[in-house]
UniProtKB/Swiss-Prot annotation:
Native organism taxonomy: Archaea, Thermoproteota, Thermoprotei, Desulfurococcales, Desulfurococcaceae
Keywords (A to Z) from UniProt: Ribonucleoprotein, Ribosomal protein
Stored InterPro entries: Ribosomal_eS30
Region of interest: Disordered: 1-28
Composition bias, Basic residues: 11-28
Species of origin: Aeropyrum pernix (strain ATCC 700893 / DSM 11879 / JCM 9820 / NBRC 100138 / K1)
GO terms of biological process kind: translation
Transmembrane segments annotated in the record for this chain: none
Keyword Ribonucleoprotein in record: yes
Entry GO terms, CC: ribonucleoprotein complex; ribosome
Protein name per Swiss-Prot or TrEMBL: Small ribosomal subunit protein eS30
């Protein structure tokens, strides 16, 4: 039973791709994050229907 490609080529594409610097993420506390989700899902939909 053979393998799908040789193990010597494993990770070839990932090594060739250029490394990009990490982007800064806004890390909201869970309470604020849930409030923002609620506003997007519920309040904006309700105001659009009214």
């Amino acid at each position: 039973m053979g393998t799908h490609g040789s193990l010597t080529k494993a990770g070839k594409v990932r090594k060739q791709t250029p490394r990009l610097p990490a982007k800064q993420k806004k890390n909201y506390p869970p309470r604020l994050k849930n409030r923002l989700k609620y506003q997007v899902r519920i309040e904006k939909v309700a105001s659009a229907r009214a």
